[in-house]
Amino acid sequence: MNICGYSPESINEGEGLRAAIFISGCKHYCPGCFSPKTWNFEYGEPFTLARQREIIRDIAGNPLLDGLTILGGDPFFSAREVSGFIDLLHLEAGPVPVWIYSGYTYEELSAASDSDEYALLGRCDVLVDGRYVEALRDPSLLYRGSSNQRLIDIKQSLEHGEAILWQSVFTK
């Protein structure tokens, strides 16, 4: 698996100050995608164990971070490898809230409870789901590009067996 970007601090990919990792590879090929170069699974750098530990040290060493966001590309095309990274993150840095982006919908990702995608979903807290649809582009939306995309509270959704929208801690 390759990563095509890492930002130790970002306010664009989820609520609060977050680290962001961009996973290479996507097969959705959404017209108007903001980063089509990330579709290539070989783009960027290998996500070696040494690089993973370096990023985990960054995250653990920054008390201002509210969590980690994983996007791409689409991380669910490398679900097993991304799950392994999240496991290592939690082992070495403790509980870190994880947001994840996907062109798949929550319903698609949660359909098969024995899949690698379902396992990855269960390791995360918030899912930004759905393909980017250029005709539904809305720059006023928080954390997503088109109005069909949703912010899903994964833990609540898995518990209730249906997609439950995420609620901001800053606007409750």
Model regions and ranges:
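Conserved Radical SAM active-site core
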Residues: 1-4, 17, 35-117
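N-terminal pre-triad scaffold of radical SAM enzymes
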Residues: 2-29
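Residues at the C-termini of beta-strands that transition into short coil/loop
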Residues: 7, 131, 155
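Structured loop/turn residues at beta-strand edges in well-structured enzyme cores
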Residues: 28, 63, 119-122
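Structural recognition of alpha->loop->beta junctions
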Residues: 53-56, 113-136
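Conserved C-terminal portion of the radical SAM core fold
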Residues: 61-70, 97, 128-134, 158-172
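P-loop/Walker A phosphate-binding loop and immediately adjacent motor/lid segment at beta-alpha junctions
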Residues: 78-90, 99, 137-172
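A generic structural signal for alpha->beta connector loops
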Residues: 95, 123-124, 148
